[in-house]
Amino acid sequence: MFGYKCNLQTDTEVITYIFDYLVRVQGLTLGEAASVVAAPFWSTIANKTDMEDKEKHTYLRTLFPSLLVTGPFSIVLGYNGGLMALNDRLKLRSMVVGEKDNKVYIASEEAAIRVMEPNVENIWAPAGGEPVIVNVKEGCF
């Protein structure tokens, strides 16, 4: 599909190629690509009051319908300058995010974050299909 050849034949490989195609080839932002892969339901789009947001999501769902990933997934995607975490739009796979100082922790459950940072200050569970985009400052690590 789109010139990619899946060698491993795993969902991880397919999702990686989808993001490469959307971001690198098509020029979408990470947030827009997330809105394709874990697209809001048509009823959710129809109920949006922000017309610009409504038109954007309608456009993306119409233009890239075959790139919607309908099964359960929770991914962390690295890119030059940071990372993005995303789970499926139904939240069939859990994902929790925590923050402490200038660090961000992402795991499938809060307990895993607390093992890494017992005094984590801000913990939340993003909604299904809500991307968490973390930009890393140059020279931090």
Where are the predicted features?
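Conserved short alpha-helical segments that host acidic/polar catalytic motifs at enzyme active sites
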Residues: M1-F141
